[in-house]
Swiss-Prot record:
A GO cellular component annotation in the UniProt record: cytoplasm
Binding site for a divalent metal cation 1: 225, 236, 433
Cofactor(s) for this UniProt protein: Co(2+); Zn(2+); Mn(2+); Fe(2+)
EC number: 3.4.11.18
Comment on bound cofactor: Binds 2 divalent metal cations per subunit. Has a high-affinity and a low affinity metal-binding site. The true nature of the physiological cofactor is under debate. The enzyme is active with cobalt, zinc, manganese or divalent iron ions. Most likely, methionine aminopeptidases function as mononuclear Fe(2+)-metalloproteases under physiological conditions, and the catalytically relevant metal-binding site has been assigned to the histidine-containing high-affinity site.
Main location: cytoplasm
Keywords: Aminopeptidase, Cytoplasm, Hydrolase, Metal-binding, Protease
One MF annotation (Gene Ontology) recorded for this entry: metalloaminopeptidase activity
PANTHER family xrefs: METHIONINE AMINOPEPTIDASE 2
Catalytic activity, as annotated: Release of N-terminal amino acids, preferentially methionine, from peptides and arylamides
Protein residues bound to a divalent metal cation 2: 236, 305, 338, 433
Protein name per its UniProtKB record: Methionine aminopeptidase 2-1
HAMAP family cross-referenced by the UniProt entry: MetAP_2_euk (MF_03175)
Amino acid sequence: MAAKVADDVANLKLDDSNTKPASGAAENGDKPTGDAEHDDSDDDNEAEDGAPEAGEGAAKKKKKRKPRKKKKAAGAAGAGGAKVQTAPPRVRIDEVFPNDSYPEGEIQEYVNENAYRTTNEEKRHLDRMNNDFLTEYRKGAEIHREVRQWAQKWIKPGMGLTEIAEGIEDSVRALTGHQGLGNGDAQIAGMGFPTGLSINHCAAHYTPNAGNKMVVNYEDVMKVDFGVHINGRIVDSAFTLTFDPVYDNLINACKAATNAGIKEAGIDVRMSDIGAAIQEVMESYEVEIKGEMLPVKCIRNLNGHSIGHYTIHGGKTVPIVKGGDQTKMEEGETFAIETFGSTGKGYVRDDMETSHYAMKADAPKVALRVSSAKTLLSSITKNFGTLPFCRRYLDRMGHDKYLLGLNNLVSAGIVEAYPPLCDIKGSYTAQSEHTFVLRPTCKEVLSRGDDY
């Protein structure tokens, strides 16, 4: 289009050559839009000074062909460009980033024997071929960042856990553009797993069921753990929220330990080495609560994990204490390193009412005698597949009186139940988690943000 406008202006200059020389900009082929208004103002002056009739005609002709349409088109393009996110987040992320060009995560170079990967041409070629799945991961990571950064400002003491969980989940669904109510819609994009809101001695896997009246108080330590997925690429990240600065050292211990684990991670690195690095950092911290100095302990039976396609726990575990697993990380794998610190025993057990569930990828085919179990299994398969879900999600989809059928699926080994995991009462636990991918040339910490 720009070329066409330039030709029109050049023709006008030739027509007007008897009254005024063509501008140097037009002769040199510069963009006409920058000089269009200047040329028209010159023509107006000539008309006022009694320029010949031919000159007036040329001036009028030029004014008629003034490239207003181009300006209008530019304005329309601006109106249809990137939008600004709202609070609470409700603008689809592909409207904030209309070209599907999402921010890259934090890049960490490989070290020691893997340092050559940064400059190796073959590895760089492989890296360039991975853009499709990385775009999906980065999209999910950006949604996670925008939702959690809003949530950290929004959550206040006295708010109910149900309100908090639904606020986060509604925001994720709005940004993905998938409400998860139609068959299969939740498997296209949306929640990677239910929002965990585990308070104080409860370390993980707690989300409110229907009718829950719990609130978060000023003196509480709440772990906020939620996932976002795009076409089964799950971004898993968690932070600990407090209102009382007395717990800062507990939170800082987990953040530092998670960063140490990510730094140690890499292709061909043994899981046990990562666990040792995490424990060394975590247990170097202490926290003073109510006048008592307490050591921060790793919760030794909680781990990080690999992430598979539509599978939050991909088969490999990343310990947060030394010893144990000698399995190595491999190129192309995605991991969530999550660390848990505790002022209690540093060991969790199943406790409280179960809310988290997931269908097993290798679920056995067994005869179900409870009719509600058959109906529920069909719905779970269509709507969640192997993605974790909670009872609130079943309520939201219109299921009722499903608990007998759900328990039947659990006892049959088709669905796995994930009860809350708790340390001793009176203790405080914290969590920090990031998702990263082992690219051929570097580690990309997908979920890294300005907040953590």
